[in-house]
């Protein structure tokens, strides 16, 4: 029985954590302890570190032919910083303004004004030790080229013109509202702390996020755009019907 107990400790509770949120009482803690035991999670396993290195292809554009496609999927992106980088929290504000919510620059121009797509987004995807800045959309085959040019146009605007305080305030209010929703219920609160634990972030991550959203300036947004939104290194991947 001792051997079975040792196997259980090593394989079933190693590298695990229990998160309790809401109205947590001593009785609840006692019941959880009785159910899982006092040694739950104490036998940490040394998991191998996973790495996902990116190797950029030399081509600026990759086209994947889909002869019968009515629309084309367009992806644009390149490698960028991770969440632990000092610039990341303010870069989040830039990416939200650029393509991270319904009123973003990309949505306002390419969807609302030009009508090239029903939706377009920009954000940062994360992998161990690396980040991927990605712009994603779908459009009619005939609009692929003008759509891509409008993406570059919006990047140029961010390089050349400081955003207005009015626009920055709208983005701030949106992001602060999203942050509030992350803590409004016991389930969302526990999800927030699970995110911290599994992403290897410090406990002050959310307070630093709040500070960054409130303090970032138009000049900083412009500087970040010039350093992290680079047309020359942006790769284009298109899957659809090639027009002659």
Describe each PLM feature range.
Residues 107-108:
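Phosphate-proximal small/polar/acidic motifs at interfaces that engage nucleotide phosphates
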Residues 1, 103-104:
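Short linear Ser/Thr-Pro motifs
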Residues 44-103:
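His/Glu-based metal-binding/catalytic segments typifying zinc-dependent metallopeptidases
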């Amino acid at each position: 029985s001792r051997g079975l107990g040792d196997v259980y400790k090593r394989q079933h509770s190693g590298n695990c954590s229990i998160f309790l949120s809401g109205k947590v009482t001593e009785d609840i803690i006692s019941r959880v302890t009785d159910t899982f035991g006092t040694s739950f999670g104490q036998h940490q396993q040394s998991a191998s570190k996973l790495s996902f290195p990116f190797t950029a292809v030399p081509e600026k554009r990759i086209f994947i032919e889909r002869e019968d496609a009515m629309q084309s999927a367009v992806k644009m992106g390149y490698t960028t910083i991770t969440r632990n980088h000092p610039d990341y929290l303010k870069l989040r504000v830039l990416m939200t303004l650029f393509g991270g919510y319904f009123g973003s620059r990309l949505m306002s121009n390419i969807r609302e004004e030009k009508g090239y797509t029903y939706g377009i987004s920009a954000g940062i995807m994360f992998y161990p030790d690396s980040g991927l800045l990605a712009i994603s959309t779908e459009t009619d085959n005939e609009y692929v080229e003008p759509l891509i040019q409008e993406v570059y146009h919006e990047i140029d605007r961010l390089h050349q013109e400081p955003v207005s305080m009015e626009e920055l305030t709208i983005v701030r209010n949106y992001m602060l509202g999203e942050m509030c929703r992350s803590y409004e219920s016991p389930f969302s609160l526990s999800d927030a702390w699970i995110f911290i634990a599994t992403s290897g972030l410090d406990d002050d991550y959310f307070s630093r996020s709040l500070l960054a959203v409130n303090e970032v300036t138009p000049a900083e947004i412009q500087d970040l755009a010039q350093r992290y939104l680079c047309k020359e290194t942006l790769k284009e991947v298109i899957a659809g019907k090639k027009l002659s």
